[in-house]
Amino acid sequence: MGAVSRDDYIALCTELVEHDRCYYVLNQPTISDYSYDVKMRELQEIEVQHPEWKVSWSPTMYLGDRPSGQFPVVPHSSPMLSIANVYSLQELEEFFSRTEKLLGYSPGYSLELKIDGIAVAIRYEKRLFAQALSRGNGVKGEDITANVSTIRSLPMRLPQEAPEDLEVRGEVFLSYEAFEELNACQREQGKLEFANPRNAAGGTLKLLSSKEAAKRKLDLSVYGLITDQKKRSHFENLQLCSQWGFFVAGMPKQCRSRQEVVERIREIEEMRAALPMAIDGVVIKVDNIAHQDRLGLTSKHYRWAIAYKYAPERAETILEDIVVQVGKTGILTPVAELAPVFLSGSRVSRASLYNQDEIEKKDIRIGDSVYVEKGGEVIPKIVGINLAKRSLESEPWKMPSLCPVCHEPVVKEKVSVRCINPLCSGGMLEKICFFASKSALNIDHLGEKVVTKLFEVGLISSCSDIFALTEEDLKQVPGFKDRSIQNLLASIAGAKKVALDRLLTALSIPFVGSSGAIALADHFVTLDKVIEASLDELMSIEGIGPKVAASIVAFFSKHENREEIRRMQELGVQVLSKQSDKEAPLQGKVFVLTGTLQQMTRTQAEERIRSLGGKVSSSVSKSTYAVIAGSEAGGKLKKAQDLGLSIWNESELLRILDAKSVS
């Protein structure tokens, strides 16, 4: 690691915070586990060398997996920590040596599959399924009982030989077969496909409808047992779990020596491709429970366990073409078109090439036989070339000098190539898709396929055009039926009230992601103040460096960008300013939504409640301030009535939200 400045340190913290959010909250990883671990180790080294730089929000202070706010947070019975990773046999040997030194002798080990899923804790009371929690921050987790209860392999009642009260911990996952079925359904409905089974499992656990979750065929593999009746070994605990009706994947094995562990690691790696679910390694645990207790834990990891991570799965296929896409900020990105190949449980036909420099560095050419890997990335990447199969007639690939969409000259930047034509339809289409996406305004029923169709028929050519759409416009579009038209218009109407940080994210300001948008909203409070902010004001915000500040100033200095915002406001868009505690009339009040809302989506209702300081829970309790009952409200409404809670209809909620007062 070379010399670093405090700005470099802040930038690395900011980057890792965003990766954490994408991985743990959105379940949309942006880098591979290995790359993340390398960056995290670099951050830890910097903080050791410069402790005076350390900020309170550093990713090294947390385990990740922040609560989404959609589910109540509940304390764990005991810490639910992550397991440290190793990527080589040498690192594994260091774990063995460290463990044996602490114990004073060589213990036995148990070894099990490391399923690539979502960790959960499941409690049983009087042998009946009672509650399920996500890992959360390791101390508290979100209550995901409703969605976990849809898992068919999870026993709702335990046999008499099981303890009355116990907790199991396990991994929720989707089999390859269930994952393919789910993505087929997504395609049929015109929705985006999930990148991998883990993303799909994580997204399913965060669904607000357990009925929808039940359709997705989640599965659960148990890897731990907590009970007052402690057994001698972890392996015995897993055997008991299996006897009580839990699924325990992958034939856990007791190993008496280091060599047995290594042999088992190699055996599983050989059979990995034939497994019905995705795994990314194996977990090695000290088998004796008393030994585990002696070894204890750190603030983040168990000392008695380690995860040996396999290299990402790799396949060889033909690079048939390289196509260039124009992104939402005008950056040209080359994408490899591949002969379809099956990899990590899904069919792969495209791979990321990043930029011209990356292509030149690897000397990637059309027609090459290439090696493709799929880690946690949205699309796979090319990691090597089989030069023995390269044609003598192949030629190096060059980035076009003209934009492939608008055919205007492009500009070469330090790393990227950018189309600077503000009217380029390619960049604008990507910008509109992002504007409506879950990561930005989250407009239901306005996915990528719908945006593309509306763009192609000329109904929208800018983000503000979305808010000008009418029923008459949509009736002209082939395939649009009355119900889908009404659903889309209702979603658009609901999106007209938008939190400041959401809008700043949606505008696609170069170098400003969601964390930067939140920082801007927290500091400036109103959109007007952000627009008029000077370079010095922007650079005074922690995490906003010179490059980002200059980009923000440049963005808002352009007439077309200010005009776009003005038009949105003319079409009814209201930017909800960040509320201080004193200005938050719903501060500390807990709401529960049930049934179907007519004038806005549930997500939009939740965001508006939160913008005024309120909280949204998925379950009714005595601490609930009010239950918002839409049409077809179910059991939550009945429970609220039984508890004598306040029950509001949608109109009452809108009145409170619009008045910004509960009086």
UniProtKB/Swiss-Prot annotation:
The keyword Manganese applies. The active site is at K114 (n6-amp-lysine intermediate). NAD(+) binds at D33, Y34, S35, Y36, D37, S82, I83, E112, R135, E171, K285, K309. Zn(2+) binds at C403, C406, C419, C424. GO terms for cellular component: cytosol. Residues 581-663 form the BRCT domain. Pfam families: BRCT (PF00533), DNA_ligase_aden (PF01653), DNA_ligase_OB (PF03120), HHH_2 (PF12826), HHH_5 (PF14520). GO terms for molecular function: DNA binding; DNA ligase (NAD+) activity; metal ion binding. InterPro entries: BRCT_dom (IPR001357), BRCT_dom_sf (IPR036420), DisA/LigA_HHH (IPR041663), DNA_ligase (IPR001679), DNA_ligase_AS (IPR018239), DNA_ligase_CS (IPR033136), DNAligase_adenylation (IPR013839), DNAligase_N (IPR013840). Keywords: DNA damage, DNA repair, DNA replication, Ligase, Magnesium, Manganese, Metal-binding, NAD, Zinc. The keyword Magnesium applies. It is an enzyme of class 6 (ligase). DNA ligase that catalyzes the formation of phosphodiester linkages between 5'-phosphoryl and 3'-hydroxyl groups in double-stranded DNA using NAD as a coenzyme and as the energy source for the reaction. It is essential for DNA replication and repair of damaged DNA. This is DNA ligase. It comes from Chlamydia trachomatis serovar A (strain ATCC VR-571B / DSM 19440 / HAR-13). The gene is ligA.
